[in-house]
Amino acid sequence: MPMNVRLQPQVNISGDAERAAQGFGRVSRETPPAFDPGRQGEAAAAFFESHGYVVLSDCLSPGELAFLNTFCDRTQAQMPEVWGLGERRKPHHRNQGLIYSQPLLDHPELDPYVRHPRSFPVVARLLGGEERVRFAEFNLRETPQGAGAGAMNFHHDMVREDRLTRTPYMPCDWLCAIHYLSDVIPGAPCFCVVPDSFRYASLKEAYVGLGEGYREVPLYGQAGTCILYDTAIFHTRLDGDGDRMRRTWHQYYARGGWLRSALPTTDRYIRPPASVLTDWNLFPERLARSDDAATRLFFSHWNTAMGEWAAGGFDPAVRAAMPRGEQ
């Protein structure tokens, strides 16, 4: 791997640039609880529902960690361009350091991970049941050693406007599972959240609205740790010392199905299925057209690009012409 991959620093526009390079500089020293999903799934879900995120411990075995890290090492060596290690780095590479956006398309050996037995039951609980969970995205990322400080702005991912006022709030519409593939200790780039911020339209509104409760919480953990977060919560990659690396697996899920009114006097629909997360993500034919009905349902959340690719018989040329089609 070349050693000249550098993050492009952002200007702090989400918070207060006079106070900090990221956010408002109110970085918490607290260590949030970590839950064993096998024994504490209900408690983990309750924590998420209250705060918009939860830390799950020991979600990947040593063998799984070795497999995924070997996969990353091998594909970086054999297909450097898909990670952003070639001469022409795409904007999404520059924002993330290194990212392999769509590894599922060509690597069925990753299929067992999309509904991982440690984290997926908690995901299903949060989205309203296993039959409500839809696949959205699976990617692998790395902040390379010596990449410097990126000063990524705090942001939320995909949101629905009704999140600001709806009652009840849950189930959420999208959530992401970040699995640490390397130890994330102080000094390393770290996933960082603003708890309880999913009801706010901007970080500045959250800062005012949460008052003394506003805090930016770094989530450190050993390799195998999983963090689930509501895509409406404000979060960032908190810079470390600019030298240490971090490697992660990110998987996004969407909520499927129509939600009925909670009122006993009506059965009208009140919330539609979550919309598609991106306009470019594609699903492998082997999964989208699986013989297994539950797998087909899980991979049924198609965007227009996916629909056009399927209509074209999953033609490789159609895929290659799409953004990130071969990345």
Where are these regions (language model features)?
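Catalytic core of non-heme Fe(II) oxygenases with the double-stranded beta-helix
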Residues: A147-Y220, R260-D267
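Active-site rim elements
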Residues: H107-P112, G213-V217, T236-L238
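A structural signal for short, well-ordered beta-strand segments
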Residues: F138-L140, A177-H179, W249-Y253
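Non-heme Fe(II)/2-oxoglutarate
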Residues: M3-P33, C226, I233-F234, L238-Q327
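Short, solvent-exposed loop/turn segments at secondary-structure junctions
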Residues: L60-P62, L140-Q145, V159, D183-P186, ...
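Non-heme Fe(II)-dependent double-stranded beta-helix
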Residues: P2-S50, S57-D162
